[in-house]
Structure formats: structure tokens, C-alpha cells
Amino acid sequence: MSSPGRPKGEYRSAQHAGAVAGPPGRPDGEHRGSSGADPNGRLRQACDSLGLRVEAAQADKLLAYLAQMQRWNRTYNLTAIRDPEQMLVQHLFDSLSVVDPLSRVVGADTAATVYDIGSGGGLPGVVLAIMRPTWQIGCVDAVEKKMAFVRQMSGVLALPNLRALHARVEELPPAGCDVVISRAFASLNDFASLAGRHVRNDGTLVAMKGKVPEDEIQTLHQQGEWQVQEIQALQVPALDAQRCLIWMRRSQGTL
């Protein structure tokens, strides 16, 4: 598996203008664009801007997933975001923004194993399963109703590569994943402490964040086992807010 290209123990900080404050660990930004525009057209434009090739069947599944989330959300409170326009941008486009970066590390057509920790309603795990059908995706969450939704999506959307794991991440047996990712789970140190055991020796932890969490990085490095390898700025289509990926690898000499 290739790496983002930074030596262990070092990281590259990406400065990015336009931050909008939001909840700790996953700031919500302001979206731009017309809510009246055709969702299919907007989805294809977003994929184009992200350098993603999306087949018609994949676009249909992405929009069906979003529609099902809106439907389930009325009863099961899968997400605090309820406005369809905000869900399109802050959930779907945000999750799509990590597909290409992950593909560059593990390969787009490999049989990579990826865990999505604290997945909630399947973000970004369901999106990854749709866009990369050869990847084996495990969505992990301690809330049963959210995993019931992901399990339903695996069947409704015909995603045999998607599994829903209703459990606390620390209680699952080690999975030997190529990548373990989280979108709104915990601080970097807590994420590494709880989920790092599921990453194979040369694998990668990836945290989706808003602005660069400098304090969290310092705390992580003080613990010594995991180091930030790279900070990659993301530009989410139609979203005026900072987004970044924090890539982490085990420090030299730790297993």
C-alpha cells in the first residue's frame, strides 16, 4: 500500500481560509448553491470537481441513499441535519471528497479492507461502498438503529461489500484493515487509542476534520504510538468551510 508521501513522525500542515465554527470535532460549514437545482446534475458536477468518475448506477445509488436517509431520519434521528440541501452538501459531497485521496493510497480497484468508525448512518462508509465496489467496508457504531439503517442500505442498494457492525469499536476483534477512517468520532488520540488496533502494521488511520486540530496533534504525538504523517486540505463542492484529512501511521518501533 502506498502512502501519502510523508516520513513518519513529520506532518505537513495545510492552511485553508474560510473556516466556519461548528460542533467540536466536525464543524458544520455554510453551503453555497441552489437548492432548486437538479440533484443528479449537482451530484455529477460535484464528482467532476472532485476528479471522480461516477457511473449512472452509482449516481442512482448515492441519491437513493440520501433519499432513504431523509425518510428514516423523520423517525430514527440518524443525523441532526434535516434540510435536503444541507444533507446533499454536508453529508454526500463531504463523504465523496475522501474517495480519491483514499484511492490514491490503497488503489481504486483493490480488495482493500476499510472500517468506518462512529459511522452513524453510514458516512462515509456507504458512500465508499458505492463508489469503490471492490473495497470491503465495515461501518461500526454503538447505536443499533443507525446500524440497522446501514444494514438496510446494504440490501436495498445491492452493496455486498458493505457490512454494519453494531458494537463499540474497542470490543471488536482486530480486523487488520488497510485503512480505518472516522468522520465525527473522537479526538485524534482517542481515535488512535480505540481504533488503532484494527489497522494492520503498515496500514493507516485517517480522520476527517474541519480546521487543523493542532492541540489534538500535539496530544497524539505525546503519546508516542501514532504520528501524523500528513494533513491534506480538502475542498468540498458547494461548501464554504475548512475540511482536511489527518493521515496517521504508527511510529517507528511500535506495533
Swiss-Prot record:
Catalytic activity: guanosine(527) in 16S rRNA + S-adenosyl-L-methionine = N(7)-methylguanosine(527) in 16S rRNA + S-adenosyl-L-homocysteine
Classification via Pfam families: GidB (PF02527)
InterPro entries, sorted: rRNA_ssu_MeTfrase_G (IPR003682), SAM-dependent_MTases_sf (IPR029063)
Annotated segments matching region Disordered: 1-44
EC number(s) recorded for this UniProt protein: 2.1.1.170
A cellular component annotation (GO) from this entry: cytosol
Cellular localization per UniProt: Cytoplasm
Keyword S-adenosyl-L-methionine applies: yes
Alphabetized GO MF terms: rRNA (guanine-N7-)-methyltransferase activity
Keyword match Methyltransferase: yes
Family: Belongs to the methyltransferase superfamily. RNA methyltransferase RsmG family.
Protein name (database record): Ribosomal RNA small subunit methyltransferase G
Source species: Bordetella petrii (strain ATCC BAA-461 / DSM 12804 / CCUG 43448)
